[in-house]
Amino acid sequence: MAYPDFTLENKLSGVIAGVDEVGRGPLAGPVMSAAVVFTNRNIIIEGINDSKKLTAKNRQVLYEKIISVAKFGIGMASVAEINSYNILQATKLSMERALVNLGIELDYVLVDGNQPPKVKWQVKSIVKGDSLSVSVAAASIVAKVARDQLMQELHNQYPEYNWYKNKGYGTKGHIDAINLYGVTEHHRKSFAPILNSTKRALL
């Protein structure tokens, strides 16, 4: 398996943050982003990769290591904001908040994908950035673990939706629960499956 490295970071100068998001596709819960800066790139954490390629256990271990040596910020856009704007704009908003919460001045921002937020720093968009840049991959891990922890908390409020397992994604079990129990304030009512369920409930 190929792992990301600091090649992209080393081509640039100054303080560089990697940014990634998680939770664009789920039917419930916020979208979250993380920004990570490795001020010392000589520190090597083995195993850092795109969070989707890691097990939950490995993500947790790497998360603890990352936050112990790197500076990080986490940003969130709420379900209300997703419904009011759209998921793309809400995602950018969560990225902007993650960078603000990082709390340091930057020279460059490396963003996974091709839809970067509008920020005051120079931004470089990288398709599959979480497979190329250690900073972006680390951000994907921090964002994923943070969101999973939040979905566990929301699951404790509404256990019938199994959010601890599906993380709000539109699994068959989640859709069945929506049809049986209805939608909550944590569901994205602007998303088609939720919108259709709400319309059926009003018939």
Curated annotation (Swiss-Prot):
Keyword Manganese: yes
Single biological process term from Gene Ontology: mismatch repair
Catalyses which reaction(s): Endonucleolytic cleavage to 5'-phosphomonoester
Gene3D superfamilies (UniProt xref): Ribonuclease H-like superfamily/Ribonuclease H
EC number(s) per entry: 3.1.26.4
Annotated positions binding a divalent metal cation: D20, E21, D112
CDD domains linked to this entry: RNase_HII_bacteria_HII_like
Job of this protein: Endonuclease that specifically degrades the RNA of RNA-DNA hybrids.
RNase H type-2 domain residues: 14-203
Compartments it resides in: Cytoplasm
Stretches of the chain forming a coiled coil according to its record: none
Key words of the record: Cytoplasm, Endonuclease, Hydrolase, Manganese, Metal-binding, Nuclease
The keyword Manganese belongs to this UniProt entry's keyword annotation: yes
Cofactor: Mn(2+); Mg(2+)
Name of the protein: Ribonuclease HII
EC category: hydrolase
Sample GO molecular function, one term: RNA-DNA hybrid ribonuclease activity
One cellular component term from this protein's GO annotations in UniProt: cytoplasm
Cofactor note text: Manganese or magnesium. Binds 1 divalent metal ion per monomer in the absence of substrate. May bind a second metal ion after substrate binding.
Family classification: Belongs to the RNase HII family.
